[in-house]
């Protein structure tokens, strides 16, 4: 379990790396949580795994590799604070992945992972991000599409 000081540092790192250009994201898409999943794709959108890969490895957009290691050998300095993404698609279905990206605290209230598609209840939000999600509905679906393919 991470200490509160480590969690504060992680939140600060995430907030500091968010570029202003991405602050123009639209409001959140409506969704329904069923059990431990968001079964329906956000906005009825279809994700693209190649775009999802670009989001996951981009340390200015998804920021996933700051904490998660994964099957991206060309990416240096992957994190080791969060679960390995290598076989995440075998462990979790698309709905479970979607909920963890949209609002990981619904699954684990103690997580340091930010809610990527929520605007309420967030802590230490930069003014440029107030009222805006970190990822659009399309970006969430793209990341889900990628993660669902990671089955090794």
Can you name each region flagged by the protein language model?
Residues 61, 108, 152:
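Short sequence/structural segments immediately N-terminal
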Residues 42-46, 55, 65, 69-106, ...:
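Gly/Gly-Pro-rich "capping" loops immediately C-terminal to redox-active cysteine motifs
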Residues 25-59:
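Electrostatic cytochrome c docking/interface patches
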Residues 1-5:
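N-terminal secretory signal peptides that target proteins for export/translocation
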Residues 8-20:
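Bacterial N-terminal signal peptides
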